[in-house]
Amino acid sequence: MKIRYAAKTDVGMKRTHNEDYFSLIEDEQLFLVADGMGGHASGEVASKMAAETIGEFYQRTREDEDATWPYKMDRSLSYIENRLVCGIKLANLRIFETSNRDLRYKGMGTTIVSCLISGDKIYVGHVGDSRVYRLRDNAIAQLTRDHSLLEDYKEAKPDMTEEEERNFPHKNVITRALGMRETVQVDIRSHQIKSGDVYILCSDGLSGMVVDDQIAQISTGAKSLERAVAELVDAANRNGGTDNITTLLLQCLAA
């Protein structure tokens, strides 16, 4: 599978610094977006630390196949899934320990969303409310479930209206993030890739400002992936830009 990609991050219209971070590990075809949180710029420390820790784990286990993993393998998951989950769990532990050891970073945390491509499959692992969408045949589908109070409430009340969603008082409160606790549950799923698929990784600075249909329209209508990520960021800023905005687009084509 041939992969093309483009990414863009932006501080937005209301924030003074950018706590989002994205990373590409091309040798592994692993792509990451993290949305940090915490006072005094510690959120940007957490998001970068998450991506770097995962990258370091992948490098170490690639160079030394006998390297000891910090967590036991889950027998219900494949080797590829276990490796991704382990990297994310290790990032969680490092952020948690740093937060507890250094008062400058107390309370810091981050979301993480990851896509790893192997053969004709894409593996999606995430914690928090950063998202992955798939564009296929001009239709958009969300492949992740937000770990948020709003999502929990929607599951308890499936007939919730769009207006009720917009006015939900705690819609930005997440229930899971890296660094909140010593251990973390990572959601991971695999999906079959179809040639022509586009996968969109993003922080909630995009998904909270631009509705899904508009994300699809911009992504399919742009002349290139580079134009698409720029136009998505512009749309989020036009709609208020209340948060940092990061988006990473992957296009999968038959080799």
PLM ranges: what are they?
Residues M1-A255:
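PP2C/PPM-type serine/threonine phosphatase catalytic domain
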